[in-house]
């Protein structure tokens, strides 16, 4: 037995300039076929539906605006201190900023990009955008 769904449809006859309102009765299979054929159509019904979300996948995005974090995204050492490859902080361990606005120690990002992997590593390790240093 197919469930009958009442639907109000308002037709706009532009040649006559008046609105006619009529009731249509459609079976649920006809309704689904119509919605499949015309996915942009929203039909008003009095049917309420209850759903349960069993799984939810969430994705977030963030970026440093001015290299504003205090630590390197690779070695997690403070920018004020030296990276793992340097003995002393300063000009020998410069901070570099990518076009994605993520900041790293120069030695850390150079080592990251040069590391052998199956995939190209000329990408920011935090956001995977192509890595280019802001000059």
UniProtKB/Swiss-Prot annotation:
Location within or outside the cell: Nucleus
GO biological process terms, semicolon-separated: anaphase-promoting complex-dependent catabolic process; cell division; embryo development ending in birth or egg hatching; meiotic chromosome segregation; positive regulation of mitotic metaphase/anaphase transition; protein ubiquitination; regulation of meiotic cell cycle; regulation of mitotic cell cycle
GO molecular function: cullin family protein binding; ubiquitin protein ligase activity; ubiquitin-protein transferase activity; zinc ion binding
Annotated pathway: Protein modification; protein ubiquitination
Keywords associated with the record: Cell cycle, Cell division, Developmental protein, Meiosis, Metal-binding, Mitosis, Nucleus, Ubl conjugation pathway, Zinc, Zinc-finger
InterPro entries in UniProt: RING-box_E3_Ubiquitin_Ligase, RING-H2_APC11, Znf_RING, Znf_RING/FYVE/PHD
Source organism, top-level taxon: Eukaryota
Cellular component per GO, a single term: nucleus
Effect of residue 100 to L: Loss of ubiquitination activity
Transmembrane segments: none
Consequence of gene disruption: RNAi-mediated knockdown is embryonic lethal with the display of a meiotic metaphase-to-anaphase defective phenotype marked by arrest at meiosis I at the one-cell stage of embryogenesis.
Comp. bias (Polar residues): 18-32
UniProt-annotated stretches for the region Disordered: 1-39
PANTHER family in the record: RING BOX
Assembly with partners or alone: The APC/C complex is probably composed of at least 12 subunits: apc-2, apc-10, apc-11, cdc-26, emb-1, emb-27, emb-30, mat-1, mat-2, mat-3, such-1 and gfi-3. Interacts with ubc-2.
Function: Probable component of the anaphase promoting complex/cyclosome (APC/C), a cell cycle-regulated E3 ubiquitin ligase that controls progression through mitosis and the G1 phase of the cell cycle. The APC/C complex acts by mediating ubiquitination and subsequent degradation of target proteins. Developmental role in early embryogenesis and the metaphase to anaphase transition in meiosis and mitosis. In vitro, recruits the ubiquitin-conjugating enzyme ubc-2 to exert ubiquitin ligase activity.
Name of this protein: Anaphase-promoting complex subunit 11
Source species of the chain: Caenorhabditis elegans
């Amino acid at each position: 037995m197919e469930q009958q769904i009442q639907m109000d449809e308002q037709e706009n006859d532009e040649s006559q300039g008046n609105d006619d309102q009529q009731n249509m009765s459609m079976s649920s299979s006809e309704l689904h076929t119509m919605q499949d054929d015309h996915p942009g159509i929203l039909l008003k019904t009095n049917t309420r539906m209850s759903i349960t979300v069993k799984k939810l996948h969430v994705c977030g995005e963030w970026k440093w605006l001015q290299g504003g974090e205090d630590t390197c995204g690779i070695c997690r050492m403070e920018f004020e201190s030296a990276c793992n490859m340097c003995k002393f902080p300063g000009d020998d361990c410069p901070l570099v900023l990518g076009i994605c606005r993520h900041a790293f120690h120069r030695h850390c990002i150079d080592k990251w990009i040069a590391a052998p992997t199956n995939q190209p590593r000329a990408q920011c390790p935090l956001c995977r955008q192509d890595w280019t240093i802001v000059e």
